[in-house]
């Protein structure tokens, strides 16, 4: 059901600065930057092997802004790739609580759903179904 870790997300106050730090400090370049009006965030995606680091800067009210205000910058969520998100939600929903009642459109054309943090040790957890293995090949959200 879970195929792999898709990405690890971190909330930052200044996305441009964070992208620069990853590039200069670790030699890791962002392959794309995009904005989600639905989630009220700007995001940068940095490939590390077959997993991505997602840097998230809140640009308005929402979960990411709430997290930043409560916890400061840092680890925000982990995302697991699933083959069929509706089946995964049905299977996992019998023991875990979802924040999303149905999948939503996420970055790069993925279908995504978030679990209630209390379900998995206070860690935001996202499930993502992607049609293509390569995140950068997806249609832009």
Regions found by a protein language model. Give the residues of each.
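A cross-kingdom feature marking solvent-exposed beta-strand/loop segments within repeated
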Residues: 4-6, 28-40, 59-76, 94-112
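Short, structured motif recognition centered on aromatic/hydrophobic residues
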Residues: 5, 12, 22, 46, ...
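Amphipathic alpha-helical segments
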Residues: 16-29, 88-94
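Short loop/beta submotifs within extracellular cysteine-rich repeat domains
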Residues: 29, 53, 63-64, 122-123, ...
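C-terminal "cap" of GNAT-fold acetyltransferases
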Residues: 36-51
